[in-house]
Amino acid sequence: MQDKSIKKIVLAYSGGLDTSAIIPWLKENYGGCEVVAFVADIGQERGDLEGVEQKALQSGASECHVVDLREEFISEYVYPVLQTGALYEGTYLLGTSMARPIIAKAQVELALKVGADALCHGATGKGNDQVRFETTYTALAPQLKVVAPWREWDLRSREALLDYLKERNIPTTASLEKIYSRDENAWHISTEGGVLESPWNAPNKDCWVWTVDPLEAPDQPEQVTIAVEKGRVVAVNGEALSPFGCLDKLNAIGARHGVGRIDIVENRLVGIKSRGCYETPGGTIMVNALRAVEQLVLDRDSFKWREQLGLEMSYVVYDGRWFAPLRKSIQASAEALAEEVNGEVVLQLYKGQVTAIQKKSANSLYSEEFATFGEDEVYDHRHAGGFIRLFSLSSRIRALNEKK
């Protein structure tokens, strides 16, 4: 049931076919309401932003606001997740999941600024993004109403959307030929649909956008040096850069070596399994650099705790609960562990692989004196016997009981 009391809606606008159709649809179905378009710049293809304001206005928006969120996205969303080591279902670096809360937060801020009484997104009724957007809306501005066109309208195909715009003389560069659904930001690009809808089909070359085929990558490996401070990448090859600057540089380096490709089937929050090809070249390099420093710095219990934090964080972020107390608690714990994660790593990139070949840290717990396989004077091997007897005591008692 469409709420005719809504007077002004802020739409999360991308300039694509769906959100271009949403603007006139909102005006027609919500009593001629005013639609303000909000565009989040989170590092997507620059061409997607060219002319986006004019496109929004031509579609019927009263205003279009483009907000640069690139640095905030990497510094305040990506880096905290990196510190936990989160990988959803062991492989996915959460590129789309991390982007939705910052988009929704900035959208809410604009809505409050312009006096809107509703928020709108273009996420479908089968995906995770509707949950992520609306959970954020509720956490930050529960008084604002939410409009989700894909759960209301009867425009169910790309052809129907194109016809809808054509009937209203609204220009669009979209065409029927689009096969794949893609999501892109500074951290990653994902590809779904098309040939990927059957898990028995191998991805073709069109399923990959950023990275070269690892088999066609350079025959000579490339080394890259990463500086890490408090679990955050701060410099690449000796050049101090902002968080976005570090990622942007590593994306370019990693992409030419075919780094960061995964092809996975994941469990969506809404109960559906979906398949996607994800490319995260710079992020994959960063993850390897951080793990290399952690190997030097974190003791066994701290490393195990960090792994548990990463597992919990992966579900919190994937499920869209960024503004929940649990995420803040996990992040605080991860930041405490990361205080000592400082160092420098040299990684070798070769045909899709990333290998840490050199690493050092002022906080390293690695001691050559204790670790040597040669003769040493700092470790008394006789001490190990007592430790083993105590460590295995419960096993000894159990075995003795079984013999009674």
Swiss-Prot record:
GO molecular function: argininosuccinate synthase activity; ATP binding
Pathway: Amino-acid biosynthesis; L-arginine biosynthesis; L-arginine from L-ornithine and carbamoyl phosphate: step 2/3
Localization per record: Cytoplasm
CDD domains, sorted: ASS
Pfam families in the record: Arginosuc_syn_C, Arginosuc_synth
Annotated binding of L-aspartate, by residue: T124, N128, D129
Catalytic activity: L-citrulline + L-aspartate + ATP = 2-(N(omega)-L-arginino)succinate + AMP + diphosphate + H(+)
Record-listed L-citrulline binding positions: Y92, S97, N128, R132, S181, S190, E266, Y278
Keywords: Amino-acid biosynthesis, Arginine biosynthesis, ATP-binding, Cytoplasm, Ligase, Nucleotide-binding
GO biological process terms on file: argininosuccinate metabolic process; L-arginine biosynthetic process; urea cycle
Assembly mode: Homotetramer.
HAMAP family, A to Z: Arg_succ_synth_type1 (MF_00005)
Protein name in the entry: Argininosuccinate synthase
Lineage, uppermost ranks: Bacteria, Pseudomonadati, Pseudomonadota, Gammaproteobacteria, Enterobacterales
Gene transcribed to yield this protein: argG
